[in-house]
Amino acid sequence: ASLITNIIIVFAFPVLTVALAMGTFDRLFGTHFFATTNGGMDMLWANLFWIWGHPEVYILILPAFGIYSEIIPTFAGRNLYGYKTMVLSMVLISLLSFFVWAHHFYTMGQGALANSIFSITTMAIAVPTGIKIFNWLFTLWKGKIRITTPMLYSILFIPLFTIGGVTGVMLGMSAADYQYHNTMFLVAHFHMVIIPGVVFAMLAGLTYWWPKMFGYMLNERLGKLAAWLIAIGTLVAFMPMFISGLDGQARRMYTYSESTGFGLWNMIAFVGAIILAIGFIVIVYNIYYSTRYASRDIPADPWNARSLEWAIPSPAPAYNFAKTPVVETRDAFWTAKKSGKSLFKGDYKEIHMPNYSGQPIIAAGFLFVFGFAMIFSMWVLAIISALGFFGCLIYRTFEKDDGYHISPKERSEEHTSELQSHTEI
């Protein structure tokens, strides 16, 4: 998932970079790339933006799919069903993601041929996505399912995301889009894709890898309560928008006349937003409560998980692996636990570690100030921040940093016998 996402990034983000550069020249130097005066074209911006913008949706969702593909097999106690088809489906999604952007322009006069082509590609991209849904369902089939907080998010994701996906296919029909375009139906579709698809995955992954990051687990009862509140809040907030959108409620308007009849649906959506907010408040409280009261005496592998990071202590040491693991299968740690063999062979060796540095965040701070100054034409501040940014780069380039070394003895002492013992499956 990460590999394919980064390939999309390599091809998609240069388009956005060029578009933003052209917009900057329009604002600061009086060019007319996007202004209709002197031969510019505003639709050029729309096309450049969405050539990046729609692959960006898959830049968001593919890592989330990877998280679900890690969590669901762990708590179903089964191998991921159809691993090769899952990979192939992601490849197809990444390719098709560059050929769907013009579905945002069905109603803007681009012609029947263009509308037909992009309608086909938009509906076609649902096929590999649907394959992934069925593979997750087949992974759950006959599995020994454990309903933990990460698994609850993953299970709730499937029906809610399917609602968002099916309505996306509806939006892909160019003829019907004249009814949907710029209505609350579109808003509901987007949020029913992004919240279950991305936000649920982030929350599931946060809960799942929290013990590996910090050495203690988040409270399960509070975690499940938050998951249910967020799922219910999502449905209550956005399902009414499908109805009001089909009834003609336009988006991007701050108020509506009472005579439109949208008041009831908007009030229900408001209640759903409140439920969503309560769910996120519970998550924040869970972090506070668990940080203060949770036990720090947890095993390296509290979930009985599958991937290699669970073979090292929790929280993970700075050097990660004291010995390089021997990987012979796709789920090497899972296989090692089943066979009773160790992943780690050979002697401890000295590890060279870099020193800590504040240069990256300082450079990023200068770059933030530079962008702010350029937007508001604060030229002196822009020059100072630009010099500061390049100064950080130059300093970092020529900084002598020999780092430090961790001896084999130190590592053998840090790695307890717990590392070599595996939970029974």
Predicted regions and their residues:
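...captures the hydrophobic TM-helix bundle architecture rather than a specific catalytic motif
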Residues: 1-417
